[in-house]
Curated annotation (Swiss-Prot):
GO molecular function: ATP binding; histidine-tRNA ligase activity
Highest rank taxon of the organism: Bacteria
Organism: Mycoplasma genitalium (strain ATCC 33530 / DSM 19775 / NCTC 10195 / G37)
Lineage: Bacteria, Bacillati, Mycoplasmatota, Mycoplasmoidales, Mycoplasmoidaceae
One of the GO BP terms on file: histidyl-tRNA aminoacylation
Assembly, per entry: Homodimer.
Any one of the GO CC terms: cytoplasm
Entry similarity comment: Belongs to the class-II aminoacyl-tRNA synthetase family.
A Pfam family assignment: tRNA-synt_His
Protein name: Histidine--tRNA ligase
Cited PROSITE patterns: AA_TRNA_LIGASE_II
Keywords: Aminoacyl-tRNA synthetase, ATP-binding, Cytoplasm, Ligase, Nucleotide-binding, Protein biosynthesis
Originating gene: hisS
PANTHER family assigned: HISTIDINE--TRNA LIGASE, MITOCHONDRIAL-RELATED, HISTIDYL-TRNA SYNTHETASE
Amino acid sequence: MNFLQKPRGVKDWFGDELVYFNWIVKKIRSLAFNWGFSEVKTPLFENAQLFQRSNANADIVQKELYQFFDKSQRELALRPEATTPIVRLACENKLMQEANFPLKLFCIGSMYRYERPQNNRFREHWQFSCEVFGFSNLFIFLDTLLFANSLLEALGITGYVLKINNLANFETLSKWNKALKDYLTPYKLELTELSQKRLEKNPLRILDDKIDQKKSFVKNAPKITDFLDASAKQDSELLKTQLKKHNISFEWTDNLVRGLDYYTGFVFEYVKNQDTILAGGVYDNLVEELSSNPTPALGFACGIERLINCLEIDKKAFILNTKPKQMLVICLFEEALEELVWLAKLWREYNQVTIYPKVIKVDNGIRLANRLGYTFIGIVGKTDFDKKAITIKNLVSKQQTIYTWNELGERNVF
Protein backbone atom coordinates (compact mmCIF):
# COMPACT_ATOMS: atom_id res chain seq x y z
CA MET A 1 0.00 0.00 0.00
CA ASN A 2 1.32 3.44 -0.96
CA PHE A 3 1.73 5.43 2.27
CA LEU A 4 1.10 8.63 0.28
CA GLN A 5 -2.37 7.39 -0.64
CA LYS A 6 -5.25 8.02 1.74
CA PRO A 7 -6.95 4.97 3.28
CA ARG A 8 -9.98 3.51 1.52
CA GLY A 9 -13.30 5.12 2.37
CA VAL A 10 -12.08 8.57 3.39
CA LYS A 11 -11.69 11.80 1.45
CA ASP A 12 -9.54 14.92 1.46
CA TRP A 13 -11.27 18.28 1.73
CA PHE A 14 -9.94 21.18 -0.35
CA GLY A 15 -10.90 23.57 -3.15
CA ASP A 16 -14.55 24.14 -4.04
CA GLU A 17 -15.84 21.20 -1.99
CA LEU A 18 -14.33 22.65 1.17
CA VAL A 19 -15.98 25.98 0.35
CA TYR A 20 -19.36 24.17 0.12
CA PHE A 21 -18.60 22.28 3.35
CA ASN A 22 -17.76 25.42 5.32
CA TRP A 23 -20.79 27.27 3.94
CA ILE A 24 -23.16 24.45 4.96
CA VAL A 25 -21.65 24.13 8.44
CA LYS A 26 -21.86 27.90 8.97
CA LYS A 27 -25.53 27.92 7.86
CA ILE A 28 -26.46 24.94 10.03
CA ARG A 29 -24.65 26.25 13.11
CA SER A 30 -26.34 29.67 12.80
CA LEU A 31 -29.77 28.08 12.34
CA ALA A 32 -29.27 25.71 15.29
CA PHE A 33 -28.50 28.65 17.57
CA ASN A 34 -31.66 30.41 16.31
CA TRP A 35 -33.70 27.34 17.28
CA GLY A 36 -32.33 27.36 20.82
CA PHE A 37 -29.65 24.64 20.55
CA SER A 38 -26.27 24.79 22.29
CA GLU A 39 -23.18 23.33 20.65
CA VAL A 40 -21.19 20.48 22.20
CA LYS A 41 -18.21 18.43 21.06
CA THR A 42 -17.58 14.82 22.04
CA PRO A 43 -14.36 12.78 21.65
CA LEU A 44 -13.74 10.89 18.42
CA PHE A 45 -13.53 7.69 20.46
CA GLU A 46 -15.52 6.39 23.41
CA ASN A 47 -15.62 3.26 25.51
CA ALA A 48 -16.81 0.56 23.11
CA GLN A 49 -19.40 -0.62 25.65
CA LEU A 50 -21.28 2.66 25.21
CA PHE A 51 -22.28 1.67 21.67
CA GLN A 52 -22.57 -2.04 22.43
CA ARG A 53 -25.22 -1.31 25.09
CA SER A 54 -27.23 1.21 23.09
CA ASN A 55 -27.19 -0.56 19.70
CA ALA A 56 -26.38 -4.20 20.41
CA ASN A 57 -28.14 -5.61 17.32
CA ALA A 58 -27.54 -2.72 14.91
CA ASP A 59 -25.19 -3.06 11.94
CA ILE A 60 -23.01 -0.24 13.24
CA VAL A 61 -22.09 -2.45 16.21
CA GLN A 62 -22.32 -5.92 14.69
CA LYS A 63 -20.36 -5.15 11.50
CA GLU A 64 -19.24 -1.55 11.19
CA LEU A 65 -17.75 -0.50 14.53
CA TYR A 66 -14.12 0.60 14.50
CA GLN A 67 -13.08 -0.86 17.84
CA PHE A 68 -9.64 -1.43 19.29
CA PHE A 69 -7.70 -1.95 22.52
CA ASP A 70 -5.36 0.79 23.70
CA LYS A 71 -2.00 0.11 25.37
CA SER A 72 -3.75 -0.39 28.70
CA GLN A 73 -6.11 -2.95 27.13
CA ARG A 74 -9.16 -0.70 27.39
CA GLU A 75 -11.68 -1.48 24.65
CA LEU A 76 -12.45 1.71 22.73
CA ALA A 77 -14.38 2.55 19.56
CA LEU A 78 -14.47 5.41 17.08
CA ARG A 79 -17.90 7.02 17.27
CA PRO A 80 -20.21 5.63 14.52
CA GLU A 81 -22.97 8.14 15.35
CA ALA A 82 -23.37 11.18 17.58
CA THR A 83 -26.57 10.63 19.57
CA THR A 84 -25.17 8.12 22.06
CA PRO A 85 -22.02 10.19 22.80
CA ILE A 86 -24.17 13.30 23.30
CA VAL A 87 -26.34 11.37 25.78
CA ARG A 88 -23.17 10.23 27.56
CA LEU A 89 -21.86 13.82 27.65
CA ALA A 90 -25.13 15.16 29.07
CA CYS A 91 -25.35 12.45 31.74
CA GLU A 92 -21.70 12.56 32.81
CA ASN A 93 -21.65 16.35 33.08
CA LYS A 94 -24.98 16.48 34.94
CA LEU A 95 -26.74 18.45 32.22
CA MET A 96 -29.67 16.04 32.35
CA GLN A 97 -31.46 17.93 35.13
CA GLU A 98 -35.18 18.67 35.01
CA ALA A 99 -34.43 22.37 35.52
CA ASN A 100 -32.51 22.33 32.21
CA PHE A 101 -35.35 20.85 30.14
CA PRO A 102 -35.88 21.13 27.30
CA LEU A 103 -32.15 20.55 26.93
CA LYS A 104 -31.25 21.15 23.26
CA LEU A 105 -27.76 20.16 22.11
CA PHE A 106 -26.07 19.82 18.73
CA CYS A 107 -22.76 18.49 17.47
CA ILE A 108 -20.92 18.75 14.14
CA GLY A 109 -18.13 16.25 13.60
CA SER A 110 -16.76 13.18 11.87
CA MET A 111 -18.24 9.69 12.36
CA TYR A 112 -16.67 6.33 11.47
CA ARG A 113 -18.23 3.15 10.12
CA TYR A 114 -16.42 0.21 8.58
CA GLU A 115 -18.66 -0.39 5.57
CA ARG A 116 -18.15 -0.81 1.85
CA PRO A 117 -17.47 2.65 0.39
CA GLN A 118 -20.08 3.75 -2.15
CA ASN A 119 -21.17 6.97 -3.81
CA ASN A 120 -21.67 9.55 -1.01
CA ARG A 121 -21.09 6.82 1.58
CA PHE A 122 -17.72 6.93 3.31
CA ARG A 123 -16.02 5.19 6.22
CA GLU A 124 -15.32 8.63 7.62
CA HIS A 125 -18.23 10.99 7.15
CA TRP A 126 -19.21 14.35 8.59
CA GLN A 127 -22.50 14.76 10.37
CA PHE A 128 -24.71 17.33 12.04
CA SER A 129 -26.67 15.85 14.93
CA CYS A 130 -29.18 17.62 17.19
CA GLU A 131 -30.90 16.23 20.27
CA VAL A 132 -33.74 17.43 22.53
CA PHE A 133 -34.04 16.01 26.07
CA GLY A 134 -36.87 16.23 28.58
CA PHE A 135 -39.86 16.09 26.24
CA SER A 136 -41.06 13.92 23.37
CA ASN A 137 -44.68 14.97 22.98
CA LEU A 138 -46.37 15.83 19.69
CA PHE A 139 -45.51 19.51 19.86
CA ILE A 140 -41.78 19.10 20.48
CA PHE A 141 -41.74 16.54 17.65
CA LEU A 142 -43.46 19.02 15.34
CA ASP A 143 -40.98 21.70 16.37
CA THR A 144 -38.10 19.36 15.53
CA LEU A 145 -39.62 18.52 12.14
CA LEU A 146 -40.02 22.22 11.39
CA PHE A 147 -36.36 22.72 12.28
CA ALA A 148 -35.39 19.98 9.83
CA ASN A 149 -37.58 21.58 7.15
CA SER A 150 -36.03 24.99 7.81
CA LEU A 151 -32.53 23.53 7.62
CA LEU A 152 -33.10 22.08 4.15
CA GLU A 153 -34.87 25.25 3.07
CA ALA A 154 -31.94 27.41 4.25
CA LEU A 155 -29.58 25.30 2.14
CA GLY A 156 -31.84 25.62 -0.91
CA ILE A 157 -32.47 21.86 -1.06
CA THR A 158 -35.76 20.84 -2.66
CA GLY A 159 -37.30 17.79 -4.30
CA TYR A 160 -37.20 15.59 -1.22
CA VAL A 161 -39.89 13.36 0.31
CA LEU A 162 -40.58 13.35 4.05
CA LYS A 163 -41.40 9.82 5.25
CA ILE A 164 -42.85 9.20 8.73
CA ASN A 165 -43.83 6.20 10.82
CA ASN A 166 -44.85 5.56 14.42
CA LEU A 167 -42.86 2.79 16.15
CA ALA A 168 -44.82 3.35 19.38
CA ASN A 169 -42.74 1.64 22.09
CA PHE A 170 -40.52 -1.37 22.76
CA GLU A 171 -43.50 -3.59 23.62
CA THR A 172 -45.10 -2.85 20.25
CA LEU A 173 -41.78 -3.30 18.45
CA SER A 174 -41.26 -6.65 20.18
CA LYS A 175 -44.66 -7.90 18.96
CA TRP A 176 -43.95 -6.64 15.44
CA ASN A 177 -40.50 -8.25 15.43
CA LYS A 178 -41.95 -11.62 16.44
CA ALA A 179 -44.67 -11.40 13.79
CA LEU A 180 -42.10 -10.51 11.13
CA LYS A 181 -39.87 -13.39 12.13
CA ASP A 182 -42.76 -15.87 12.01
CA TYR A 183 -43.93 -14.49 8.66
CA LEU A 184 -40.51 -14.30 6.96
CA THR A 185 -39.04 -17.59 8.18
CA PRO A 186 -40.69 -19.65 5.37
CA TYR A 187 -39.09 -17.22 2.88
CA LYS A 188 -35.64 -17.37 4.50
CA LEU A 189 -33.84 -18.84 1.49
CA GLU A 190 -35.26 -16.11 -0.74
CA LEU A 191 -33.69 -13.39 1.40
CA THR A 192 -30.20 -11.99 0.94
CA GLU A 193 -27.45 -13.47 3.09
CA LEU A 194 -27.45 -10.37 5.28
CA SER A 195 -31.22 -10.50 5.78
CA GLN A 196 -31.02 -14.18 6.69
CA LYS A 197 -28.71 -13.21 9.57
CA ARG A 198 -31.01 -10.36 10.57
CA LEU A 199 -33.99 -12.71 10.64
CA GLU A 200 -32.75 -14.21 13.90
CA LYS A 201 -31.94 -11.06 15.88
CA ASN A 202 -33.37 -8.01 14.14
CA PRO A 203 -35.97 -8.83 11.46
CA LEU A 204 -37.13 -5.20 11.38
CA ARG A 205 -33.98 -4.31 9.43
CA ILE A 206 -35.06 -6.60 6.59
CA LEU A 207 -37.73 -4.03 5.75
CA ASP A 208 -34.90 -1.52 5.21
CA ASP A 209 -32.76 -3.77 3.01
CA LYS A 210 -32.38 -2.15 -0.42
CA ILE A 211 -32.75 -5.50 -2.21
CA ASP A 212 -35.26 -7.39 -0.09
CA GLN A 213 -37.61 -4.44 0.46
CA LYS A 214 -38.54 -4.64 -3.24
CA LYS A 215 -39.69 -8.27 -3.03
CA SER A 216 -43.44 -8.81 -2.98
CA PHE A 217 -43.48 -11.08 0.07
CA VAL A 218 -41.55 -8.44 2.05
CA LYS A 219 -43.97 -5.74 0.91
CA ASN A 220 -46.82 -7.93 2.19
CA ALA A 221 -45.18 -8.52 5.58
CA PRO A 222 -47.08 -7.53 8.75
CA LYS A 223 -47.24 -3.77 9.33
CA ILE A 224 -46.69 -2.06 12.65
CA THR A 225 -50.21 -0.64 12.39
CA ASP A 226 -51.43 -4.17 13.18
CA PHE A 227 -49.90 -3.84 16.66
CA LEU A 228 -50.48 -0.20 17.62
CA ASP A 229 -52.74 0.42 20.60
CA ALA A 230 -55.51 3.05 20.57
CA SER A 231 -53.27 5.73 22.09
CA ALA A 232 -50.52 5.28 19.47
CA LYS A 233 -53.07 5.33 16.65
CA GLN A 234 -54.53 8.55 18.03
CA ASP A 235 -51.04 10.10 18.19
CA SER A 236 -50.48 9.19 14.55
CA GLU A 237 -53.74 10.79 13.47
CA LEU A 238 -53.01 13.95 15.48
CA LEU A 239 -49.61 14.28 13.82
CA LYS A 240 -51.08 13.80 10.35
CA THR A 241 -53.70 16.47 11.09
CA GLN A 242 -51.06 18.96 12.24
CA LEU A 243 -48.83 18.35 9.22
CA LYS A 244 -51.72 18.78 6.80
CA LYS A 245 -52.89 21.89 8.65
CA HIS A 246 -49.50 23.52 8.09
CA ASN A 247 -49.13 22.28 4.49
CA ILE A 248 -46.15 20.03 5.20
CA SER A 249 -46.05 17.30 2.56
CA PHE A 250 -45.30 13.81 3.86
CA GLU A 251 -45.72 10.10 3.16
CA TRP A 252 -46.86 7.87 6.01
CA THR A 253 -44.68 4.78 5.57
CA ASP A 254 -45.75 1.79 7.69
CA ASN A 255 -42.54 -0.16 7.04
CA LEU A 256 -40.15 2.71 7.82
CA VAL A 257 -37.62 1.67 10.46
CA ARG A 258 -34.34 3.22 11.52
CA GLY A 259 -31.00 1.43 11.55
CA LEU A 260 -30.38 2.12 15.23
CA ASP A 261 -31.94 0.06 18.02
CA TYR A 262 -32.89 2.88 20.37
CA TYR A 263 -35.70 4.48 18.33
CA THR A 264 -39.28 4.34 19.62
CA GLY A 265 -42.26 6.54 18.83
CA PHE A 266 -42.22 8.68 15.70
CA VAL A 267 -39.36 8.23 13.22
CA PHE A 268 -38.77 10.09 9.99
CA GLU A 269 -36.53 10.35 6.94
CA TYR A 270 -36.06 12.99 4.26
CA VAL A 271 -35.31 11.14 1.03
CA LYS A 272 -34.01 12.63 -2.24
CA ASN A 273 -33.08 10.54 -5.29
CA GLN A 274 -33.43 7.37 -3.18
CA ASP A 275 -30.83 8.60 -0.68
CA THR A 276 -31.69 9.49 2.91
CA ILE A 277 -30.34 13.00 3.48
CA LEU A 278 -31.71 13.63 6.99
CA ALA A 279 -33.30 11.26 9.50
CA GLY A 280 -34.20 10.85 13.13
CA GLY A 281 -36.94 10.23 15.62
CA VAL A 282 -37.91 9.65 19.23
CA TYR A 283 -35.75 7.56 21.58
CA ASP A 284 -37.44 7.71 24.98
CA ASN A 285 -35.56 4.75 26.48
CA LEU A 286 -31.94 5.49 25.54
CA VAL A 287 -31.10 7.79 28.45
CA GLU A 288 -32.56 5.31 30.94
CA GLU A 289 -30.71 2.45 29.25
CA LEU A 290 -27.39 4.23 29.73
CA SER A 291 -27.94 6.01 33.04
CA SER A 292 -31.01 4.53 34.81
CA ASN A 293 -32.55 7.99 34.60
CA PRO A 294 -35.83 7.90 32.57
CA THR A 295 -35.74 10.87 30.20
CA PRO A 296 -37.74 11.31 26.98
CA ALA A 297 -35.71 12.48 23.99
CA LEU A 298 -35.68 12.91 20.23
CA GLY A 299 -33.41 14.25 17.52
CA PHE A 300 -32.09 13.90 14.00
CA ALA A 301 -28.88 13.86 12.01
CA CYS A 302 -27.77 14.65 8.46
CA GLY A 303 -24.56 13.91 6.57
CA ILE A 304 -22.66 16.94 5.26
CA GLU A 305 -21.40 15.04 2.20
CA ARG A 306 -24.95 14.19 1.15
CA LEU A 307 -26.11 17.76 1.69
CA ILE A 308 -23.30 18.95 -0.60
CA ASN A 309 -24.42 16.43 -3.21
CA CYS A 310 -27.98 17.81 -2.98
CA LEU A 311 -26.97 21.42 -3.63
CA GLU A 312 -28.28 22.72 -6.95
CA ILE A 313 -25.79 24.02 -9.53
CA ASP A 314 -26.95 27.63 -9.13
CA LYS A 315 -26.59 27.32 -5.35
CA LYS A 316 -23.02 26.09 -5.75
CA ALA A 317 -22.26 29.02 -8.06
CA PHE A 318 -23.72 31.39 -5.47
CA ILE A 319 -21.58 29.88 -2.71
CA LEU A 320 -18.40 30.20 -4.78
CA ASN A 321 -19.26 33.82 -5.54
CA THR A 322 -19.61 34.57 -1.82
CA LYS A 323 -16.36 32.96 -0.70
CA PRO A 324 -13.72 35.31 0.80
CA LYS A 325 -12.03 37.63 -1.71
CA GLN A 326 -8.30 36.99 -1.64
CA MET A 327 -5.47 38.91 -3.29
CA LEU A 328 -2.04 37.81 -4.48
CA VAL A 329 0.45 40.69 -4.40
CA ILE A 330 3.39 40.54 -6.81
CA CYS A 331 6.48 42.73 -7.02
CA LEU A 332 8.14 43.68 -10.28
CA PHE A 333 11.53 44.52 -8.74
CA GLU A 334 13.62 43.24 -5.84
CA GLU A 335 13.73 46.36 -3.65
CA ALA A 336 9.94 46.34 -3.12
CA LEU A 337 9.80 42.85 -1.59
CA GLU A 338 11.23 43.67 1.83
CA GLU A 339 8.97 46.70 2.26
CA LEU A 340 5.85 44.82 1.17
CA VAL A 341 6.40 41.95 3.62
CA TRP A 342 6.04 44.48 6.46
CA LEU A 343 3.22 46.41 4.78
CA ALA A 344 1.18 43.24 4.18
CA LYS A 345 0.98 42.71 7.94
CA LEU A 346 -0.95 46.00 8.20
CA TRP A 347 -3.09 45.31 5.13
CA ARG A 348 -4.24 41.97 6.58
CA GLU A 349 -6.14 43.80 9.29
CA TYR A 350 -8.96 44.30 6.76
CA ASN A 351 -7.94 42.37 3.62
CA GLN A 352 -6.86 38.83 2.75
CA VAL A 353 -3.41 39.23 1.27
CA THR A 354 -0.67 36.85 0.14
CA ILE A 355 2.75 38.18 -0.91
CA TYR A 356 4.46 36.25 -3.72
CA PRO A 357 7.99 35.91 -2.29
CA LYS A 358 10.02 36.60 -5.44
CA VAL A 359 10.05 38.98 -8.38
CA ILE A 360 7.71 37.91 -11.18
CA LYS A 361 6.47 39.37 -14.46
CA VAL A 362 2.88 40.68 -14.61
CA ASP A 363 1.59 38.11 -17.12
CA ASN A 364 3.12 35.23 -15.18
CA GLY A 365 1.70 36.64 -11.94
CA ILE A 366 -1.82 36.87 -13.39
CA ARG A 367 -1.65 33.30 -14.68
CA LEU A 368 -0.46 32.14 -11.27
CA ALA A 369 -3.21 34.04 -9.42
CA ASN A 370 -5.89 32.58 -11.71
CA ARG A 371 -4.54 29.06 -11.30
CA LEU A 372 -4.49 29.36 -7.51
CA GLY A 373 -8.03 30.75 -7.34
CA TYR A 374 -7.33 34.34 -6.27
CA THR A 375 -10.01 36.93 -7.04
CA PHE A 376 -7.60 39.87 -7.13
CA ILE A 377 -3.98 40.52 -7.98
CA GLY A 378 -2.03 43.43 -6.52
CA ILE A 379 0.84 44.73 -8.66
CA VAL A 380 3.67 46.87 -7.32
CA GLY A 381 5.96 48.29 -9.98
CA LYS A 382 8.60 51.02 -9.66
CA THR A 383 6.12 53.86 -10.28
CA ASP A 384 3.62 52.44 -7.76
CA PHE A 385 6.36 51.93 -5.19
CA ASP A 386 7.63 55.51 -5.45
CA LYS A 387 4.05 56.78 -4.91
CA LYS A 388 3.45 54.33 -2.04
CA ALA A 389 0.60 52.85 -4.06
CA ILE A 390 -0.55 49.49 -5.44
CA THR A 391 -2.52 48.62 -8.58
CA ILE A 392 -5.26 46.08 -7.79
CA LYS A 393 -6.89 44.16 -10.64
CA ASN A 394 -10.13 42.19 -10.35
CA LEU A 395 -9.41 38.94 -12.21
CA VAL A 396 -13.12 38.36 -12.86
CA SER A 397 -14.30 41.79 -14.04
CA LYS A 398 -10.82 42.81 -15.32
CA GLN A 399 -11.26 46.23 -13.71
CA GLN A 400 -8.26 47.72 -11.95
CA THR A 401 -7.90 50.47 -9.36
CA ILE A 402 -4.95 52.21 -7.74
CA TYR A 403 -4.95 52.43 -3.93
CA THR A 404 -2.48 53.97 -1.51
CA TRP A 405 -0.78 51.73 1.00
CA ASN A 406 -2.59 53.53 3.81
CA GLU A 407 -6.01 52.79 2.27
CA LEU A 408 -5.35 49.05 2.38
CA GLY A 409 -4.42 49.35 6.03
CA GLU A 410 -7.59 51.27 6.93
CA ARG A 411 -10.43 49.37 5.22
CA ASN A 412 -11.48 46.43 3.09
CA VAL A 413 -10.97 47.52 -0.52
CA PHE A 414 -12.62 44.45 -2.05
